[in-house]
Amino acid sequence: MIMHSNYDPNIIEKKWQRYWEEQHAYACDIDPNKKKYYVLEMWPYPSGNIHMGHVRNYSIGDVIARIKRMQGYNVLHPMGWDAFGLPAELAAIKHHTQPADWTYTNINEMRAQLKRLGYSYDWQREIATCDPDYYQWEQLFFVDCFEKGLVYRKKAPQNWCPSCNTVLANEQVIEGSCWRCDTSIIQKELTQWFLKITDYAEELLDDLTTLKYSWPDRVITMQENWLGKSTGVEISFPIESSQDFITIFTTRPDTIFGATAIILAPEHPILETLLNDTPQKEKLYNVIEKMRNMDRLERQSNLLTKEGIFIDRYCINPCSGDKIPIWIGNFVLADYGTGAIMAVPAHDQRDFDFCKKYNLPISIVIQPDELQINEHTIVEPWTGLGTLIHSGQFTGLTNKEAKEKITQYLEKIGKATRVVSWRLRDWNISRQRYWGTPIPIIYCKNCGVVSVPKNELPVILPTNITINEDGSSPLPQESSFIDCMCPQCGGIAKRETDTMDTFVDSSWYFARFVDPKNTKQPFDTSIAKYWLNVDQYIGGVEHAILHLLYSRFFTKLLRDLGYLPSNINEPFAKLLTQGMVIKDGSKMSKSKGNIVDPNQMINIYGADTIRLFCLFAAPPERDFDWSDSGIEGSYRFLHRVWRLFIDVQPHIHTTHAGNSTVIETTTALTKDVKRKEHITIKKVSEDIENKYQFNTAIASIMEFVNTLYLSKNELILTVEGKNILSSAIATVLTLLSPMTPHICEELWSYLGHSTSISLEPWPKWDPQALLKDVVTIVVQINGKVRNKFEVPMDLSKEELEHIIFNDTKITQYLEGKTIQKHIIIPNKIINIVTT
């Protein structure tokens, strides 16, 4: 075979991409004789262009997939499209087209871009969420949940984005703004559909322990905090001159004697009763309305300026009998706990800040054991351990003892109940958008709310539709979609016009990939049992709460609905969160003018160079700053590999990686090259398998290539040298092929192989080959290094002593001294102790 003298990626990459596609090289199916491995990267939204963040994410996944195949696994590595969402509607308005047309055009473009990068996807499994063949199953899940009471409809204040014209889930509001467009959100009362994710709160929390060693600590912590489990007590405070009472939630019943205010959320239902006869009713309702319109997450923030107003009513402390003023506070949330708190300023920072601002009393009821604090000099609350004071019959108890004793007392008098509270709220999945999965619900005047019969699914989203210029959904005006017959009574009815949150689409796609062509069910349970769960999932940490939490919930939901096997409790066994690709110190964006176009880079340098640089620039979990010099360096290295192969090709023969194990080496050079070959195999294997440190793995391959460059001219002079060099070249190509598959396939074929390098077994290192023939012995006298010796490995004790004690430098240090003892650690060190 005639080899090109120059490395031209544009020629060889197209050649091998065509070969892989024609051969269906990465297609897979169930094989009971093989151990499976399912690797998946978070799929993209089809915006039309991949970016460098995609390239980094997918390059990491592709390396893992390729190595696992070479290790003998049956590898599932699919790709698809998270295709519903607002951008398609905005593009349709801008370009006067249909969202479906825009979306499918982008899918075609992005598929071609991903193929240009040589990723080893099984494209026969490709799916898109906007395809009715996909979303019909999502609608089926909804109907199942409706029948089992796991989805419900209610009217409540919702996060509303005025720009996107839709509701946002709490998780989609970032610091008071829309997660997508950064517009400040407002509160709007709407009737919405909710999935009962709270039914799974305990399991979602408990099962995080099974992920402790395979998911990043940061993600585990973020999910724990979002779930927000609090074990505490609900305590009833009677309202003065009333039969009513206010129930508060607290985790600190030991501080109840220090409560100096009851603070209500502005949405608390009892306010209507409390304010009914108040002269300041109008003023109070103005304040309440202002608080209600604040962003929910802003109200939770520690940075919030805490505002409140006294409503001129009082509660009675059930322990002390003291009157406590009732306030309304902007930092109290109606849907957390009971929507009411007792403020204990002496022992809580939030309460301290609020009460100091409004000159409310501060009553110390816990005295630290080694510090004296009093109401007049206190500058910050005491939140630690201590002994109760000013607490009636409980004075003198430690606060840990008092928690239980006070709770028991309040339970006895009927004023307390032990409860568990959660920060997590049910998932609002209704969206006032067009381009999404239709919610399969029908509204009938006679029958009420009715689900679409399963045999009538899917409810097809109309695709030839006029998009409203103001961004609102056109579905409410689309009579051909809305008007229908009630499936129960046959009367005139209306369809639901809200569509599902697009995070529903991506919460179960990993399961559809295992059986994507199934037209009878979402996936066959036996097939799911073979492939699931995903062995390695890869994506950004920014999805720690939204996507990853929802996917965990959906896995448990589909298990309980009978779609997934009973032993599948988690979607992703291992999680790798990669950092961002940044440029000039900031995230790439059009507005900053620092975008690097992958297509342009491929045109200049080739896909292998781009892949190599993205893997080499930094450890995967860290951000890396794009640099032109870095990409040039990766390009030069591949040229160097090509040039090395050209130089040695006439002198080497067809062989396999690590074959030097069976070659007997007799010279210092061949022994050294053989040892470095196996050191490299070990280093690359361990760095990738155990730590996913692709950068250090690539660095070790580069070092080995340099070794071969320096030694090739001498190695080609002997048969033994040629044999060692042949094995070494095969090893370089095999180890490098998961990162840069095109160039390695090309050189592998020039080496005389007729099969793809991806079918090669991953090389194994020989422990014996790692050993040096010569070792360095360090000599210490009274703890100080006095000399070093290069000696044959495993030299006998007598021979080693003869060399050391006859060395002039050592004898100089020993002159006039008595040797008390000497200790030899074979092949490493000798310690001599003298007096």
UniProtKB/Swiss-Prot annotation:
Which ranges belong to the motif 'HIGH' region? Answer: 44-54
Record has tRNA-binding as a keyword: no
> What are its E.C. numbers?
6.1.1.4
Q: Name one GO cellular component term.
A: cytosol
Q: Where in the cell is it found?
A: Cytoplasm
Reading the lineage from the top rank, the first entry is Bacteria
Keywords recorded for this protein, A-Z: Aminoacyl-tRNA synthetase, ATP-binding, Cytoplasm, Ligase, Nucleotide-binding, Protein biosynthesis
List the Gene Ontology MF annotations in alphabetical order: aminoacyl-tRNA deacylase activity; ATP binding; leucine-tRNA ligase activity
Q: Which GO terms describe its biological process?
A: leucyl-tRNA aminoacylation
By sequence similarity, the record places it as follows: Belongs to the class-I aminoacyl-tRNA synthetase family.
- Which HAMAP family does the entry link to? Leu_tRNA_synth_B (MF_00049_B)
Q: State the protein's name.
A: Leucine--tRNA ligase
UniProt source species: Lawsonia intracellularis (strain PHE/MN1-00)
